[in-house]
Amino acid sequence: MQVYSLENVRNLADKKENWEVICSELKSLGFIITEEPIIESPHHFGVPQVRERVFILGIKEDAFDNRKKLPDGYLTREVLQVDEQLASCSENGNCLSEILEKDVDSKYYLPLEQEELLYIWEEFRENVIGLGSPFWIHKAGIGIYNRDEYLNNSEIGYQDMPEWKKKLVMKSRVMYEENYKFIDDWIARHDMLSRNLIHQKFECICGNDCKTIKDGIIQIRQSGVRVKRPNYFPSLVAMKNTPIVWDERAKHFRYVTPKESAKLQSFNSDYRFCDSDVVTYRQLGNSVNVKLVNMFAESLFNLGKKSTLLGGNVNGKI
């Protein structure tokens, strides 16, 4: 092996001791490496998915072209020319048209119960004043109209919360106090208190970019229903957390398809995955982004002796 590209979750770079062990082992194998973490995401290079990962790159010492300069003695962003390849995504701040297919099988439509849930939260979004933070029904103190009573309610457990959670929960409380007439009626009409706890949490971080949640990118996660602006997709994961979009043709909310997910990981359109959508989603959630890996491979290739890297085939390509 003459070159390599390792990828891992971003917080690996925060664990200094682990990082130093990895770097030491790679250098002991005769590699010139990126001793400082290179943290990048596809959305920095024209692919609309936020997926920050740390990359550790290296090239064998005897494969490195000594005519190239290493001012710091190791590989850096400047040597690899990473910043020269930065590119923005959609110019209008909406990436959906770049990724979404026009005709999608109905099997990707959201189940009616979950689609109904999104319409219920849309009603909430349209009517509540001051929706600038997550709203948690189960921590807002529904039916409690006295602040002191709320603060000392044992079921809510406000006094026992860590400070960060107190601040978050208090925002839900203030939102309820300022909108309790609408919220009480809304909760009763839609029987919100009996719903799954995940469905009782809502976060809309669209700013003024979405007139309705149909304009955004939605996820139903352990932390609740989350709607974000359509500039980038969230990171694909291996768990059941597939992004949801509004399909104007079908007039339904639906999941992003495996083919669309593959676009977010920069796979060629003709790449064939297995027949199981569940397995394909998991594979894509665990995958590295093809464009980033290829970009780093080309950067390493350009630093090497072509005869060494290609085994004498100087006209070869990556």
What are these model-derived regions, one by one?
Residues 1-217:
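Class I S-adenosyl-L-methionine
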Residues 125-318:
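C-terminal target-recognition/interaction regions appended to catalytic cores
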